[in-house]
Every structure is written in structure tokens, then in C-alpha cells.
A protein has these predicted regions:
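Cross-family detector of peptidyl-prolyl cis-trans isomerase
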Residues: 2-178
Length: 178
């Protein structure tokens, strides 16, 4: 064939050129980064560049949407849906242990107005039933606990998938320490 393209060669070129925009779009998508302790995060909305950035010791107000990584992404808490327009943000001090450690790690470096999606592994996710945030609705709270702390599934080695959670965090306000 030396230097000429047959029908298959031309078809391959057409196929690749048609696919190029899809690859370019894929390359433009933000990639998750390791935020520490295995927490993966991606900024969906970067936040106001002139706004305060959250750091350890700051009090923050956040809106959350939490779902299980397993169980078809079952949503166990959604501040937007539950508030029906009257949203009450969660407030906690970063590093105080008031919320699961993965959520504290996930908010560090965010700026007010930003939205970040974080995938939180079991080691820094829910360890017991005293940790916040928990669903405001009793039935969702019970379902979360019976999924994450299910003794049969934990004995079967399913703990890593059951207690991995995904949160969308909207940083509403940073209250800088003293």
C-alpha cells in the first residue's frame, strides 16, 4: 500500500477527527485532587477570589448535600431540598472534631461562594453515631446508620464501600478566628 490510504484508513481519520472535540471537552473538565487523608475533591464553583479562604481554626457556615458512594448514590441529606428555600447552614469550627474529619479536610482552602465535591473514605468518614452532620429527618438518619454500621455487611468486608460518602459543600461564610 506504500503511502496511500485505503477505505479503512480514511474511515479511521474521520472517526478520530470526529472524536477530537469529545477528548478536548474531557481534558477541560476539572480533575479531583487529593486534599489529604485520602479525601478527593474537585471545585465545581471556585468561589469569590477576593473572599476569605477557610483554614484550620476558622468557623465556617456551609450548605451540604450528602450521599453514599455505594447504594446508587442515595442522598441522605440535602440542605436545599429539606429547607424548601429556608436554608439553615451548618456551622462548625474547622479542626474541632464537631463534624466528620473528611468534611473538615474538604472545606480547607475553599473560598466563600465556592462549591466543592468531596469523596470521603471510611477512615475519615462516620466512625460512630455521634458525628455530625446527620440527616435532619429521622428515617434518613436511621437508614444512614443501618447502612454504614451494618454488622453483617461489615463482617463481609463491605465497610470500605458502605462508609465512603460524597458531599457537595457550598461555603457560605468564613468567620475568621479572633
Amino acid at each position: 500500500m506504500g503511502g496511500t490510504l485505503g477505505r479503512r484508513g480514511i474511515g479511521g481519520v474521520v472517526l478520530l477527527s470526529a472524536a477530537a472535540p469529545a477528548f478536548a471537552e474531557e481534558a477541560a473538565r476539572p480533575r479531583p485532587v487529593d486534599l489529604g487523608s485520602g479525601v478527593q475533591g474537585v471545585d465545581l464553583i471556585p468561589g469569590n477570589p477576593s473572599a476569605s479562604e477557610a483554614s484550620e481554626g476558622d468557623a465556617v457556615r456551609v450548605l451540604l448535600k450528602g450521599r453514599l458512594f455505594a447504594k446508587q448514590g442515595w442522598v441522605f441529606t440535602d440542605d436545599y431540598k429539606e429547607g424548601a428555600g429556608l436554608v439553615s447552614p451548618h456551622e462548625y469550627v474547622v479542626g474541632s472534631g464537631e463534624v466528620i474529619r473528611g468534611l473538615e479536610i474538604g472545606v480547607v482552602g475553599m473560598r466563600e461562594g465556592g462549591v466543592r465535591r468531596v469523596v470521603i473514605p471510611p477512615a475519615v468518614s462516620y466512625q460512630d453515631k455521634t458525628q455530625e452532620p446527620v440527616p435532619r429527618d429521622f428515617s434518613n438518619r436511621q437508614r444512614l446508620y443501618t447502612t454504614i454500621f451494618n454488622p453483617t455487611r461489615l463482617a463481609n468486608g463491605e465497610g470500605d464501600t458502605l462508609s465512603t460518602v460524597v458531599f457537595d459543600i457550598e461555603l457560605v461564610r468564613v468567620l475568621k478566628r479572633g
